[in-house]
Amino acid sequence: MTKYRIITFDGGGTLGALSLQLLNRLAYQNPKLISETNVFSGNSIGSFTALALASGRSPEETFDFFKDQILPAFSVSRPGGPVFNQQVPYSGLIKAIRTFFPRDLRLRDLKKRIVVPAFHLFAPELNRWNPVLFHNFLGSPYLNEKASDVILRSSAAPATQRAYQNYVDGYTVATNTSTASIAFAVGKAKQPLDQIAVLSIGTGEQPTQLRRDTKGWGMVSADNILPEDMEDLPPNWGVLLDRSPNEPLLPFLQIISGGSSYYESMVSSELLGDQFFRLNPRIPNFSKTDPSVVPALISIANKTNLRPAFQFIERNWN
C-alpha cells in the first residue's frame, strides 16, 4: 500500500477551470481524497488550488471562489497585450487572492505540505536571478512567507501580468510540479520511491504545433528585417501575428511552458511507473486569459472518462 500521496496542479490561467472541475469530480467520488493527501503542489493558478487545499478549503469552495472572484480579474484585456503591452491588469488577481487567504496565513500554518515554483529576478544573497521552490517541509527557509504572496509570485506570467515582488511565474521553472514534488518527498520527507504516488492534474492538452520553416527567425523579426509597420512583422520566435489556429502566438514562451509540462510527466513516470498518473484531457487551443472558455472547459471535464483515475486512486489512496 502506497503511503505518501501527492496531487499536483499545472498552471494555465483561466484553463484552471478544467483541473478544478476534474478535482471536484474525483473528490465527490472519493471523499477522503483530500484528507489522505500528504502534499499539494502547483504552479501559477495551480498554486492557488494547492494552497487552498493545503489550508483546509474544499475543492468545491475553491472552485466557487475561482469562478466568482478570480475569473473577473482576467476579464479586462489591455490593448496590444500580450505582445506590445502587459495583457491583464494584475490588481484584480492580487485583490482576489488576498481576499481568499487570511492576511496573516503563513506557509508554516498550512495543514499539508506544499511545493510551489517561482523565478526570482534578483536574489541579493546570490547577486543573480534564481529559480525558487517555495515549500513548508521541515527546515524550510520559507515558513514565514505569506501564502498569498507565494501564490502571486508564482502567478506573475511575463507579458500577461507584471512581476510581483520581483518574482515571475513558476512556469519558467516548472509548469508541471510533479518531479519537484517527488524530489521533496524523497529528500525532505525521506520517502522511498516505491512508497510515493502522484496524481498530476493538468489544464488541458492542446494541439499546439509549428510546422512552418523557421529559417532565419530571430526573437522579434526575421532575416534581419526591421519592418516600418508592425502589422507587417515577419514571423519570429517572439510572436506570430499571422498564426494559424493551432500555432502559438508567443512561440518561445509557449515552447518553454509546454515543453516543461511534457518533460516533467515523462520523468515522473520513469521514476514512479504505475504509481504516477497524469490526468490531462485534450482541449481546443483555448486562451489562458479568456474567461469565456470556462463553460466549455467544465463541459470537457464533465465528459472526461475518469475510470482510470478512479482506479489509480483506489489503488493508492484507500
UniProtKB/Swiss-Prot annotation:
UniProt motif (GXGXXG) ranges: 11-16
Keyword Iron-sulfur: no
Listed PROSITE patterns: PNPLA
Record-annotated active site: 44 (nucleophile), 169 (proton acceptor)
E.C. number(s) listed in UniProt: 3.1.1.-
Claim: Transferase is one of the keywords in the record: no
InterPro entries: Acyl_Trfase/lysoPLipase, PNPLA_dom, Teg/CotR/CapV-like
PANTHER family associated with the record: INTRACELLLAR PHOSPHOLIPASE A FAMILY (PTHR24138), PHOSPHOLIPASE A2 (PTHR24138:SF10)
Name of the molecule in the record: Protein teg
Native source organism of the sequence: Priestia megaterium (strain ATCC 14581 / DSM 32 / CCUG 1817 / JCM 2506 / NBRC 15308 / NCIMB 9376 / NCTC 10342 / NRRL B-14308 / VKM B-512 / Ford 19)
Lineage: Bacteria, Bacillati, Bacillota, Bacilli, Bacillales
